[in-house]
Amino acid sequence: MRNIYYTFISLIIILCINGCSKKSTPTNIYESEEYKSLSKKDIIIGESIWATSCFRCHRYGTNGAIVSENKEYWDKAAQKGIDALFKSVWEGYKGENGVMPAKGFCNLCDENEIRKSVFYMFHLAKK
């Protein structure tokens, strides 16, 4: 009887670990509630940050940055989800084509402003 009990408990633990370890697929930015619920004010804030920081590289492809008009690239990037992209912008990273500086050189920006600037980039690409 004890063996059955321990076998049952072991099975439950294995099922729980398996169920908890599965990673969910990130939501495409364009399909996320956060993107869909952006207000006009959010877009304006994102645009102002883009115009003062992001524009420097993403308008002309400086330092290997992907230009904002490259719809194909941004559509593919949108599949990574906002959290992964936000982390890359917030912390900075070295990509295939160049380096993304932390916060995109907007050192005075807070997390909310950086997030809005990321959404604005996707807003631009979708136009």
What residue ranges belong to the model's regions?
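Post-cleavage N-terminal segment of exported redox proteins
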Residues: 2-40, 120-127
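Disulfide-bonded cysteines in secreted/extracellular proteins and peptides
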Residues: 20, 54-57, 106-109
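Electrostatic cytochrome c docking/interface patches
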Residues: 24-48, 63-73
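Gly/Gly-Pro-rich "capping" loops immediately C-terminal to redox-active cysteine motifs
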Residues: 47, 56-87
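Short sequence/structural segments immediately N-terminal
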Residues: 47-50, 127
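The canonical Cys-X-X-Cys-His
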Residues: 50-60, 89, 117, 121
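Axial heme c-ligation environment in periplasmic c-type cytochrome domains
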Residues: 88-115, 121-125
